[in-house]
């Protein structure tokens, strides 16, 4: 974490890790778990007294007092005044995460014409936004990202917790972009380069994986869900049992180039016929509607929704998902397309088991930028 005077705070909050029941629980593991539990509780429940926090978390008052003291010293938690009370005794002092005392920088590299960036509050509110034209790729693309991040950092006078970046393509957990053809990146160490250039914690993840984190943390998402991001391309992020899934090849959710059906279909940019992206991307949908004419728009959208239902039915059945969330242009996705996808999903899964699976449009704007903020919150504070 970097302060106004440019000095780095050596105290870092590590990511939340699940304790394995067969592994010896060391004191430092338990303490890290308790720190994350306290901050997670405050983040979602808001200001409360130390006694309330002890009751909510199940930790002892001594442990709570110790941890809260550390958090106040680190500038993460603040006292917010006293709770009004009519009973006897000293009124309790309320504490909360210092939501106005820190900022996060989020960057979205998935747009067709520009890289978008924002300065966000800890609650995911966009406070300032900037964008730069999207270069052709390679080194020029990296320099544009770095310049955008530095411009956003210059807009705040309070400490910045970190920088989150949502990038297209396949991204390793250490922020190495394995492949992003549209940006001409292969085995590109984006996270490492940005962290060195900015002297701040930097997290780089796939853009759809960032988006699903935003829906889970700031939206109304359930604990088992698939978010499909639909724009120039099609990609997905997965949450299972409240945990993000990335897969053994770091490519979980790369459903855009899965061929849907055996009857061919429109030619995809990858060279195959009938990929989900060729049916469903916003670019292809608008092109086909323009070719067919407005009077046939519903037929185009119905076909795309049917293909979507075919694609997600085995995923829902394999992972026992509760909902499918779509992120993309509402004028294309709401209504006919979602209705067709829902009907096809029901027809292609076990009757009576998956009938309550919901396919809906996200209500969130700036979902990748907000997801980038969640990446930083999780890494630095253990909050998700």
PLM regions with names:
Residues 1-133, 137-159, 218-219, 262-267, ...:
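ATP-binding/phosphotransfer module of carbohydrate and carboxylate kinases, centering on a glycine-rich
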Residues 159-166, 170-271, 275-276, 377, ...:
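Phosphate-binding/catalytic loop of phosphoryl-transfer enzymes
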């Amino acid at each position: 974490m970097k302060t106004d005077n440019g000095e780095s705070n050596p105290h870092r909050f590590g990511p939340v890790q699940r304790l394995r029941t067969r592994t010896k629980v060391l004191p430092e593991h338990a303490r890290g778990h308790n720190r994350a539990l306290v901050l997670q509780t405050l983040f979602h429940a808001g200001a409360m007294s130390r006694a309330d926090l002890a009751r909510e978390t199940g930790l002892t008052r001594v442990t709570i007092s110790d941890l809260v003291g550390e958090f106040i010293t680190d500038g993460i938690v603040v006292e917010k005044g006293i709770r009004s009370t009519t009973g006897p005794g000293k009124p309790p002092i309320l504490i909360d995460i210092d939501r106005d005392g820190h900022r996060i920088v989020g960057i979205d590299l998935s747009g067709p014409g520009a890289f978008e960036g924002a300065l966000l509050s800890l609650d995911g509110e966009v406070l300032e936004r900037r964008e730069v034209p999207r270069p052709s790729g390679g080194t020029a693309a990296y320099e544009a990202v770095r310049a955008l991040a530095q411009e956003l950092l210059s807009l705040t006078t309070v400490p910045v917790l970190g920088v989150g970046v949502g990038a297209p393509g396949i991204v390793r957990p250490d922020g190495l972009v394995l492949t992003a053809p549209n940006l001409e990146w292969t085995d590109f160490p984006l996270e490492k380069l940005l962290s060195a250039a900015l002297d701040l914690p930097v997290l780089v993840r796939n853009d759809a994986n960032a988006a699903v984190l935003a829906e889970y943390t700031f939206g109304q998402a359930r604990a088992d869900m698939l978010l499909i991001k639909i724009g120039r391309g099609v990609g997905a992020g997965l949450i299972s049992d409240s945990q993000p899934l990335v897969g053994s090849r770091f490519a979980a959710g790369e459903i855009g180039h899965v061929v849907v059906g055996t009857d061919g279909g429109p030619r995809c940019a990858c060279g195959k016929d009938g990929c989900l992206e060729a049916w469903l991307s916003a670019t292809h949908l608008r092109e086909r509607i323009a070719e067919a004419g407005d009077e046939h728009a519903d037929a185009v959208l119905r076909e795309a929704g049917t293909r979507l239902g075919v694609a997600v039915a085995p995923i829902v059945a394999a992972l026992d998902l509760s909902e499918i969330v779509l992120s993309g242009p509402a004028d294309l996705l709401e209504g006919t397309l979602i209705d067709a996808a829902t009907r096809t999903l029901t027809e292609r899964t076990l009757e009576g088991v998956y009938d309550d699976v919901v396919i809906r449009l996200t209500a969130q704007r700036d979902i990748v930028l907000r997801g980038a903020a969640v990446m930083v919150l999780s890494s630095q504070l253990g909050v998700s």
